[in-house]
Amino acid sequence: MPSLKDLRNRITSVKATQKITKAMQMVAAAKLRRAQNAAENGRPYAERMAQVLGNLAGNLIGGVGAPRLLTGTGQDRVHLLVVCTGDRGLAGAFNSSIARLARDHANRLMADGKTVKIITIGKKGLDVLRRQFRDQIIASRDIRGNKPVDYPFAAEIADDILARFEAGEFDVATLFYSEFRSVISQIPTAQKLIPAELPTAEGAAATGAGSDAAMEFEPNEETILETLLPKNLTVQIFRALLENAASEQGARMSAMDSATRNAGEMIKKQTLIYNRTRQAMITKELIEIISGAEAL
């Protein structure tokens, strides 16, 4: 049985930990509001841009003259995985769930004889994936110095991916991130970046986002797509980073809330044990005193 001193030290240690987790919960809650607003404000622009490009692409007869960012290389041999996680832990399963999704995807590709290359955004993704894919990781970036996430940081990532694509380093690029739904719901997501997956005109009409208006484009569709597709790549990466930032703060807030409540339960349990142990010791001492008095 632990001594009273050991129990007091244990209770003091748990209380100190509880203060830390409570503070982290409050900080995450404050950051979550800003990150959530940024993610929600970025969605309409990214979705509408994809719809516009989808309408443009739908006007190309047989895909003739379409940019390579839309059609791809015509091959499916080399896949680039862009894995976005966070730099810090203590966020529940946020980082591990994204890394697991990317790892499973990479394993399936390699089992099919494909070549896999990986770019990691965030230290935690790098830490997890390099255990198995050290030779496949061709680049990595930290995001700690870029919070809150900004557009130029997304543009740097997009420019790097675009340069590697133009150099023929890969055929298909897929982005992995966590889509923010709510504080308690973040969905690990895989989105194909190259060749670009754009909504069709039929799909846009089904969701009410399309238009029946006849449109004329000046200059032609090919020229517009050639200009906008690289920008769309940056926009989609920026949106993913915003979703990731909100998901990370939501996951951390939830994890720290759970840790704070668990610490409270542990304090209650240890305090009860302490009181019972102290009461038993006092009772034992009283019995010894009474027994000694009776002996006299």
UniProtKB/Swiss-Prot annotation:
Membrane-related topology note: Peripheral membrane protein
Q: List the signal peptide residues.
A: none
Which UniProt key words apply to this protein?
Answer: ATP synthesis, Cell inner membrane, Cell membrane, CF(1), Hydrogen ion transport, Ion transport, Membrane, Transport
PROSITE patterns xrefs: ATPASE_GAMMA
Q: Which GO terms describe its molecular function?
A: ATP binding; proton-transporting ATP synthase activity, rotational mechanism
UniProt xrefs under Pfam families: ATP-synt
Function summary: Produces ATP from ADP in the presence of a proton gradient across the membrane. The gamma chain is believed to be important in regulating ATPase activity and the flow of protons through the CF(0) complex.
Q: Which NCBIfam families match?
A: ATPsyn_F1gamma, PRK05621.1-4
What HAMAP family does the database record attribute to this sequence?
ATP_synth_gamma_bact (MF_00815)
Return the protein name.
ATP synthase gamma chain
Highest classification ranks of the organism: Bacteria, Pseudomonadati, Pseudomonadota, Alphaproteobacteria, Hyphomicrobiales
What gene is behind this protein?
atpG
